[in-house]
């Protein structure tokens, strides 16, 4: 009887120690577009804004499971101005800013834009590698808009184009989240240590 109690106490001690050592970096996920701004729209009516939110919510589950605190710039179909997204992340005390997007319906590959701030390019390359062979990495200045709002975040910031805007199954969304969560968490651990 006493042996199982000893085992239970050891297990509880280990769990408490692991919990105390869990990462505490705050990561803000920014599901792009929303509300009056649908983003790209596929021929079947699939809206990029909806895909972005669903992908960000799924990614959060995996980052939280890895011990990270995660915030959002939006959690429903609302419009949030670009400048407010960065201001929200700053108010939340974010250490990393990850904008979640899907490209035009005709896009052929996923990719990642990165801000000019230290750590951003490394984070972008890490996430692009997790997205698979052929994923591109570009500075934010190379976007068709000339400059991206992620540049206004003072730390590592990326904009991930998870692929074309089209219907996406829950299984595919989960696979994408699983693929990028660990590399993001590993980067956050190193960056915030």
List where the protein language model places each region.
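Active-site-proximal helix/loop segments of hydrolytic enzymes
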Residues: 2-7, 13-26, 50-193
